[in-house]
Design a protein with these regions (language model features):
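Membrane-embedded alpha-helical bundles that constitute the cytochrome b-like, heme-associated redox core
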Residues: 1-225
Length: 225
């Protein structure tokens, strides 16, 4: 997680190019204009990247991971681990002060769903070099990446709750049957939410690094079809 944050920060300030032919780095999607009044050491990604980063930083799974890893709070959920808890139970105050901002996770979800649409659009373009259909190593990497990001986003606990978590009687609400099926499908995805979180994190890095290597001329894109 720390390494990912360092890499993303470096991308914001050190790399001024994000596109190679029909490949756009996922960190820069959707592409936005760059106002002239902003300093040149910034990149357009600053207008976009805060959405998926905020979504991950406030994610229920990632919160559990960094609370345990960085703060040892709590160390785990077992009774023995709770006995090693560094603070007494009566002093627990939940997520307060700065961490209360984690409650805006749902709003980051809305923004991430919009970004996801653009990522799928970018993936479609990756299969259309010079305007005609083609398959290459890069397009496959893009497809795997957006599929993993989709699995992570759609397995979100907040999305699952929005679809059907607050419904006690599906037959009593409009579209209840469709919501029930969607809720059950999202529940299947949700069981592996932690797995999707890590796989999509690494796929983002791999996809961006692949574009960077192409831009640097270090590698060539392998054309398959």
């Amino acid at each position: 997680m720390i390494g990912f944050g360092i890499y993303v920060t470096a991308s914001l300030f050190l790399f001024d190019r994000s596109e190679y032919e029909n490949y756009l780095s996922p960190f820069y999607s959707p592409p936005v204009g760059f106002p002239e009044w902003l300093p040149t050491w910034l990149t357009p990604a600053v207008f976009v990247l805060w959405i998926p980063l905020g979504f991950r930083a406030t994610c229920y799974y990632y919160r559990k991971a960094y609370y345990r890893s960085f703060f040892w709070d709590p160390p785990a959920c077992s009774s023995k681990a709770q006995q090693r808890e560094p603070r007494s139970p009566e002093n627990y105050r939940g997520e307060t002060a700065l961490f209360v901002l984690n409650n805006i996770h749902r709003y980051f979800l809305y923004g991430s769903l919009i970004v996801l649409v653009f990522l799928w659009y970018d993936t479609a373009l990756a299969f259309l070099p010079q305007g005609s259909f083609g398959i290459s190593l890069g397009s496959i990497i893009f497809l795997i990446n957006v599929s993993l990001i989709s699995a992570y986003t759609l397995s979100c606990h907040s999305l699952r709750h929005l679809i059907g978590g607050q419904v006690d009687c599906y037959s009593c609400v409009t579209g209840g049957n469709a919501r029930r099926k969607a809720y059950n499908w999202l529940s299947v995805l949700n069981r592996q939410h932690a797995l999707w979180a890590w796989l999509s994190l690494f796929s983002l890095l791999i996809t961006d690094i692949y574009v960077r290597l192409l831009l640097a001329g270090a590698i060539t894109d392998l054309r398959i079809l």
